[in-house]
């Protein structure tokens, strides 16, 4: 899959989908939506030990600047409209990672009257990261799986 022998003539050919997806996988800008204890693990993933910058991942403070939303923690009914509003402010294409048991399906508080039983009822989720709370390695693996999913997506030829 390398280009070692292709540069003999001075140019390389590829399709535009591969080029765009290569750029998207190498420059994901997530916006954090930390709601509970899973947000601490998300912060740890962005710190120097795991260093998401080496994957081209830079946390952005605004939804208008991000293309990935990481929902971490218990989503309450009162917070659900805010989650949807922030998701709608993100530019296309956009992806969502659901981090932790509470964001995936309500977790420990599943039977509480005030908890949404999974953030996928509010926004479409692309990657689920299990755990209570999931480790930083699990979130990193989920981000790598999202990069693989983006790489396989047909961007132009739909």
Swiss-Prot record:
Q: Which Gene3D superfamilies match?
A: 3.40.50.12280
Species for this entry:
Nitrosomonas eutropha (strain DSM 101675 / C91 / Nm57)
PROSITE patterns named among the record's database cross-references = COMPLEX1_20K
Regarding the membrane, this protein is recorded as: Peripheral membrane protein
- Top-level taxonomy: Bacteria, Pseudomonadati, Pseudomonadota, Betaproteobacteria, Nitrosomonadales
Q: Which family does it belong to?
A: Belongs to the complex I 20 kDa subunit family.
Instruction: Show the GO MF annotations.
Output: 4 iron, 4 sulfur cluster binding; iron ion binding; NADH dehydrogenase (ubiquinone) activity; NADH:ubiquinone reductase (non-electrogenic) activity; quinone binding
Mind telling me what this protein is named? NADH-quinone oxidoreductase subunit B
Q: How does it assemble?
A: NDH-1 is composed of 14 different subunits. Subunits NuoB, C, D, E, F, and G constitute the peripheral sector of the complex.
One GO biological process term = aerobic respiration
Which Enzyme Commission number(s) are on file for it? 7.1.1.-
Q: Which reaction does it catalyse?
A: a quinone + NADH + 5 H(+)(in) = a quinol + NAD(+) + 4 H(+)(out)
Mind telling me which InterPro entries this protein's record contains? NADH_UbQ_OxRdtase-like_20kDa, NADH_UQ_OxRdtase_20Kd_su
* Key word Cytoplasm present: no
Cross-referenced SUPFAM superfamilies: HydA/Nqo6-like
Which UniProt keywords are listed?
A: 4Fe-4S, Cell inner membrane, Cell membrane, Iron, Iron-sulfur, Membrane, Metal-binding, NAD, Quinone, Translocase, Transport, Ubiquinone
Q: Where does [4Fe-4S] cluster bind?
A: 37-38, 102, 132
